[in-house]
């Protein structure tokens, strides 16, 4: 009797998602990022053209070019309606859930943040910084109203612009000390406890591709926020050992300004963040073909 192999619902679900991701990636890599020069080189290496079939190949390329639909026939950026992105929200929620589990399992986020705070840029008037607790939140961002628009600085490029809303409680608690270095180093220390919370982030997010070139062989997925973003930050402070001062406005203002400046200089237009897209296009060296010598 032949026993058939049956997948569970969970296994089938993840295999299906993986298949979709692979298909989308292959489509982006080979159809969007394959330049005419790369395509021509591959055709020349795989199928060298002889004088007898050059004419037929040219006619075939011309015919193919005529029947290839333009982008406006597939997606008209001027008339297409905004998309809800419900499917995208589900994928982002699954990825974010896994990131949170990994960060909690081995305290990766806590260790990374503590190393960052105690780096070379730490002011001399602050003692060692200890992260008492950290939370990456429990809710998920909601993306909506996606629109495909032309790049403002590139006539051929497109970008996806969408609304982002995150209502959550992302926070960390820090214990440190204010150090008085006069009249001598570490003359006196004042304990300081801080609680920093990010309660909401709202704004417009733009995502676009940077195509690879000869100088930069990798392609990148870029994302940036519009300058009119809204970030809700709550700061609580406790200063002193015996007589404690609570929620000093000046401390809250300094920390909030630092956080906003850090975000603006990295993630707000014209600044952007990049995610490198792996190059899976096989090179002639990896395939074992003979490299052509340049004369």
Curated annotation (Swiss-Prot):
Homodimer. Component of the ER-mitochondria encounter structure (ERMES) or MDM complex, composed of mmm1, mdm10, mdm12 and mdm34. A mmm1 homodimer associates with one molecule of mdm12 on each side in a pairwise head-to-tail manner, and the SMP-LTD domains of mmm1 and mdm12 generate a continuous hydrophobic tunnel for phospholipid trafficking. Component of the ERMES/MDM complex, which serves as a molecular tether to connect the endoplasmic reticulum (ER) and mitochondria. Components of this complex are involved in the control of mitochondrial shape and protein biogenesis, and function in nonvesicular lipid trafficking between the ER and mitochondria. The mdm12-mmm1 subcomplex functions in the major beta-barrel assembly pathway that is responsible for biogenesis of all outer membrane beta-barrel proteins, and acts in a late step after the SAM complex. The keyword Iron does not apply. The chain crosses the membrane at residues 13-33. It holds the Pfam family MMM1. The SMP-LTD domain is a barrel-like domain that can bind various types of glycerophospholipids in its interior and mediate their transfer between two adjacent bilayers. Signal peptide: none annotated. It is a single-pass type I membrane protein. GO terms for biological process: aminophospholipid transport; mitochondrial genome maintenance; mitochondrial outer membrane translocase complex assembly; mitochondrion-endoplasmic reticulum membrane tethering; protein insertion into mitochondrial outer membrane. One of its GO terms (molecular function) is lipid binding. This is Maintenance of mitochondrial morphology protein 1. Keywords: Endoplasmic reticulum, Lipid transport, Lipid-binding, Membrane, Transmembrane, Transmembrane helix, Transport. Its main location: endoplasmic reticulum. Residues 1-12 are lumenal. It is found in: Endoplasmic reticulum membrane. One of its GO terms (cellular component) is endoplasmic reticulum. Residues 81-278 form the SMP-LTD domain.
């Amino acid at each position: 009797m032949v026993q058939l192999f049956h997948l569970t619902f969970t296994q089938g679900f993840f295999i299906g998602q993986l298949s979709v991701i692979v298909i989308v990636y292959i489509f982006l890599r080979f159809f969007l990022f394959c330049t005419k020069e790369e395509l021509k080189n591959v055709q020349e290496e795989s199928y060298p053209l002889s004088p007898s079939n050059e004419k037929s190949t040219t006619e075939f390329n011309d015919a193919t070019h005529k029947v290839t639909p333009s982008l406006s026939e597939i997606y008209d950026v001027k008339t297409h309606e905004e998309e809800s992105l419900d499917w995208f929200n589900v994928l982002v929620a699954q990825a974010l859930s896994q990131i949170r589990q990994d960060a909690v399992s081995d305290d990766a986020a806590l260790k990374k943040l503590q190393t960052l705070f105690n780096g070379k840029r730490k002011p001399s008037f602050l003692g060692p910084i200890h992260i008492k607790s950290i939370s990456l939140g429990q809710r998920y961002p909601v993306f909506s109203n996606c629109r495909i628009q032309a790049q403002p600085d590139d006539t051929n490029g497109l970008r996806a612009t969408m609304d982002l809303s995150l209502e959550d409680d992302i926070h960390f608690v820090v214990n440190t000390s204010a150090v008085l270095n006069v009249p001598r180093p570490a003359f006196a220390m004042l304990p300081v406890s801080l609680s920093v919370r990010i309660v909401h982030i709202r704004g417009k997010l733009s995502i676009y591709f940077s195509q690879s070139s000869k100088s930069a062989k990798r392609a990148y997925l870029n994302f940036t926020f519009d300058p009119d973003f809204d970030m809700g930050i709550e700061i609580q402070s406790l200063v002193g050992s015996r007589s404690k001062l609570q929620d000093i406005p000046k401390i809250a203002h300094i920390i909030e300004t630092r956080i906003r400046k850090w975000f603006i200089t990295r993630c707000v237009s014209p600044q952007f963040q990049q995610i490198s897209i792996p190059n899976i296009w096989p090179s002639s060296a990896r395939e074992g073909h003979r490299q052509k010598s340049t004369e």
